[in-house]
Amino acid sequence: MNIERADFVDRVKIFVKAGDGGNGCVSFRREKYVPKGGPDGGDGGDGGFVFLRANPSVSTLIEFVNKRKFVAENGKHGMGKKMKGRNGKDLFIDVPVGTVVKDAVTGEIIADLNEPGKIVCVARGGKGGRGNAHFATSTKQAPLIAERGEKGESRWLELELKILADVGLVGYPNVGKSSLISRISNARPKIANYPFTTLIPNLGVVKYDDFSFVVADIPGLIEGASEGVGLGNVFLRHVERCYLIAHVIDVSGYEREDPVRDYFVIREEMKKYSPFLLEKPEIVVANKIDLIGKEELEKILKRLRDATDREVIPVSAVTGEGIDLLVSKLASIVREMKVEKPERKEERFVKPSPVWRRLPEKFHLEVVKEDEGYWVVEGENLRVWIERFDLNQRDARLMLLQVLEKNGLNNKLKEAGVKEGDVVRIGDFEFEYRE
């Protein structure tokens, strides 16, 4: 799979907003011969959820460069005859397989969409409000009250793509990684005799007998990459998922003088990015052996084996010498590690419940003086009531004031110094204080 530089994006931020719940309805049954039909206001529909879904046909995050805001549909309002409003449509956003989803504010990892079809809910829709049919009692048979729908969740997300490959080719620029991947796989990357020809990771599928595996050509690293020198080390995130690292070294002596030093410089840059990378299985691929004499090659190979304590496989990506042995070794290691990996049990996706906060019955009230003769009643739990009900509805005001009085509202007003005739505001509702 080859991706053009302009189309390769592996980290973006997006904003997601779930749908709000629809409002409940205030309605009364009106039919011939039914003079006292009673309340029949229906409930509002639930707001749509926002999901991210791993889609194998999507290869980069380029689609999110120009569109960063995603909003699900709101639930419809309830209607008379106890008709519930329609639920808002859920919004599914397709991302590449291998996308890590983080909360952009806290940095918390929400999900790793590392398998095709895997789904995660990133914003829950709000539950629809209840219609007045729910508020009828033996003493209140015609309630003029209904609930507003809950607000849907919203958040900023950071999406980070980590390419899924079995083998990662790492090394200095121009050591022949692109030539190597084109020799062993179906990948056809740009190849040229200058550093940083590869600007994005290239993927290739390698077939060996009845087994196939994926190799990633990671853009070249140089000393100081962790400080941003060259292309930096940001592409190393794509090695994190690999089973095996194939460290490509130029042993020709034409462009790189000391293969052993090169090996440890790259290892140090990998360590600075993530010490975890050094724990991965690794083989050393000594490339460009066609450009060096046999006697000199043997000396270099011995130095590499002694210094690295790794298996060193000499190859020439140009002539093909040693390629069969390399592919056989890569396939053997990857096959063995895939067998050792515990089988993942298929997870059944269960849609979570919509946002719904219980109406609190206890309040920590605070009376704040905003101006001479003008006061505001505040409180964390009070916010839920204010958002849930339309206080322009008389019955909603009465119900809230009754609950507040049980929590000592009158005493709080007196303690704050509220005088008769002063204006008190609760949410959008204002009233004149009377003792």
UniProtKB/Swiss-Prot annotation:
Keywords: Cytoplasm, GTP-binding, Hydrolase, Magnesium, Metal-binding, Nucleotide-binding. It is found in: Cytoplasm. The keyword Nucleotidyltransferase does not apply. CDD domains: Obg. Monomer. Its main location: cytoplasm. GO terms for molecular function: GTP binding; GTPase activity; magnesium ion binding. Mg(2+) binds at S178, T198. Its EC number is 3.6.5.-. The keyword Magnesium applies. It comes from the Bacteria. Its cofactor is Mg(2+). Belongs to the TRAFAC class OBG-HflX-like GTPase superfamily. OBG GTPase family. An essential GTPase which binds GTP, GDP and possibly (p)ppGpp with moderate affinity, with high nucleotide exchange rates and a fairly low GTP hydrolysis rate. Plays a role in control of the cell cycle, stress response, ribosome biogenesis and in those bacteria that undergo differentiation, in morphogenesis control. InterPro entries: G_OBG, GTP-bd, GTP-bd_Obg/CgtA, GTP-bd_prot_GTP1/OBG_C_sf, GTP1-OBG_CS, GTP1_OBG_dom, GTP1_OBG_dom_sf, OBG_GTPase. The lineage of its organism: Bacteria, Thermotogati, Thermotogota, Thermotogae, Thermotogales. Residues 357-435 form the OCT domain. GO terms for biological process: ribosome biogenesis. This is GTPase Obg. One of its GO terms (cellular component) is cytoplasm. Residues 165-335 form the OBG-type G domain. Residues 6-164 form the Obg domain.
